[in-house]
UniProtKB/Swiss-Prot annotation:
Protein name: Oxygen-dependent coproporphyrinogen-III oxidase
Assembly behavior: Homodimer.
Gene source species: Chromobacterium violaceum (strain ATCC 12472 / DSM 30191 / JCM 1249 / CCUG 213 / NBRC 12614 / NCIMB 9131 / NCTC 9757 / MK)
One GO cellular component term noted in the UniProt record for this chain: cytoplasm
Cofactor(s) for this UniProt protein: a divalent metal cation
Length: 302
């Protein structure tokens, strides 16, 4: 089972993984990615790459997977019930970067391509993805830069694209059980096929390529900033929100687990260290409080 364009998408994704890993290694200056190639009994496989104990990045995971199966899992068809139970092919690159320095934000990006097939009917395909930023000690200029890159890469595809996918990102990366945003958002899109294949693929490439343009300048600006135990403790506490979101709400995590994916690769997004504290409240007016008052409530950055 293969869509006529599967090979083009796959080669883009493999190249994207290579380029992102090379750029992150260069930004770190010390650690390198270790690769773990894996295959899946039900069909497909992937290559997981993880960097640990770096100068800048405590842990960075950049995963490529290409899987297929006999029945689309519930997480993938929840919004498309007409596709439930179809044969499927899914491929994507997903990454989560957890820096050591609390002044450097955590970042996440993902681009993916799905095909669902049923005998006697035309295959249904779509793209999805996006990127989002999770700062601990956010800076206005970083938020503006992140969203400017997002807006500019969307511009050639239509003036309504950035506002729509920015809003979707704010809504998606929201911890409903805390009524709190995970971070300052970015872009999120799914079920993209109405533009036709070429334009949809071009947009997905622009998102994948735009991630490094959005993230690396922020890393460069913040990685030398001084920090101590107070900042580290707050970073570890806020990382708890990342864990809560990924295990409770994230459709990608659920899809991976429901489709019999590789658990180590799926949970590669987890921060290496994290802590919870009962009833924590930041001191009013503190830098920690500013995250909650000035940055987490969704706002128009550009």
């Amino acid at each position: 089972m293969s869509h006529p364009h599967s090979n083009a998408v796959k080669s883009f994704l493999l190249d994207l993984q290579d380029r992102i890993c090379a750029a992150l290694e260069q930004a770190d200056g010390k650690a390198q990615f270790a690769e773990d190639a894996w295959s899946r009994e039900a069909g497909g496989g992937g290559r997981s790459r993880v960097l640990t104990g770096g100068e800048v990045f405590e842990q960075a995971g950049v995963n490529f997977s290409h899987v297929h199966g006999d029945a689309l899992p519930p997480s993938a068809s929840a919004h498309r019930p007409e596709l439930a139970g179809r044969r499927f092919e899914a491929m994507g690159v997903s990454l989560v970067i957890h820096p050591s320095n609390p002044h450097v934000p955590t970042s996440h990006a993902n681009v993916r391509f799905f095909i669902a097939e049923k005998d006697g009917e035309a295959p249904v395909w779509w793209f999805g993805g996006g990127f989002d930023l999770t700062p601990f000690y956010p800076q206005e200029e970083d938020a503006v830069h992140w969203h400017t890159v997002a807006r500019d890469l969307c511009a050639p595809f239509g003036g309504d694209v950035y506002p729509r996918y920015k809003k979707w990102c704010d809504e998606y990366f929201h911890l409903k059980h805390r009524n709190e945003a995970r971070g300052i958002g970015g872009l999120f899109f799914d079920d993209l096929n109405e533009w036709g294949f070429d334009k949809s693929f071009a947009f997905t490439r622009a998102v994948g390529d735009g991630y490094l343009d959005a993230y690396l300048p922020i890393v460069a600006r913040r990685k030398e900033q001084a920090w101590g135990d107070r900042e580290r403790q707050f970073q570890l506490y806020r990382r708890g929100r990342y864990v809560e979101f990924n295990l409770v709400w994230d459709r990608g995590t659920l899809f991976g687990l429901q489709s019999g994916g590789r658990t180590e690769s799926i949970l590669m997004s987890m921060p290496p260290l994290v802590r919870w504290e009962y009833g924590y409240q930041p001191e009013p007016g503190s830098p920690e409080a500013r995250l909650y008052t000035d940055f987490l409530p969704p706002r128009d950055w550009v």
